[in-house]
Amino acid sequence: DEVGEEVGRYIRLCNYCSGLCMPEIAAMGALEGLDVMLNDALYGILFRDINMQRTLVDQFMSRVINGFAGVIINTGEDNYLTTADAVEEAHTVLASDLINEQLALLAGLPEEQMGLGHAFEMDPMLENGFLYELAQAQMTREIFPKATLKYMPPTKFMTGNIFRGHIQDALFNMIGIWTSQGIQLLGMPTEAIHTPFMSDRYLSIENARYIFNNMKNIGDEVVFKENGIIQNRAKEVLDKATVLLEKIEREGLFTALEKGIFADIKRPKNGGKGLDGVCAKGKNYSNPFVEIMMNR
């Protein structure tokens, strides 16, 4: 806040509300006035090996607190595309976003506080890859019109060639402004080489500012060709996501996670960290904060 006063603009504070202490961290974030918190049990299950029963229970209360405190949550679907193919598995990202949306609504979180995640992670050598990325981003924006979408930059196919990398980030920024993404994490030209220097971060901000200003209203001016590559790609992804969600509805979310449906990573229902902290609710169990916070 002191730096914000110094530079004359509001700076949002962000932290992670994940692991084995999701509700506790959410409470601390609320007390400290944080603006954004990563809050995603599915990410914890897949990438941090947290037990799925434990973290989904924790996630509910943590999201109740985040919703009450006005904190925007982020979800981690973008990470799926670092381990799975971004073209073939794009529908799993959308399916997970839809699941995460419903889990957030159950916890009383407004749509405007949902930073549902996705990413620009297709192979840059893919023919018409930009059109597929644009289709994915536009589709996500149309399906979640009120959400503060979190859009992640290319990392998987950053080779250390800083010149090509800067162009990849520019294409990513173009799609971000074109499709009105909510939270845009900027790519670094030195991705895959070293932890970014401040000078690298400056170049990334300069890149984004140039494109965001120069292409500010492109999304208002350009319409997509009926049954063209972009529309057909979006339809294909949506259809596959629908089929997958119907399968998950039949089998259950835990079974889907055990089978490695998301991110090509399999996790056992009774494995991972924290299961010993899960117990059945007693008949006299009561948590007054849920009702108070959800009826704010």
Where are these regions (language model features)?
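Anaerobic metallocofactor- and corrinoid-dependent redox/one-carbon enzyme cores
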Residues: 1-296
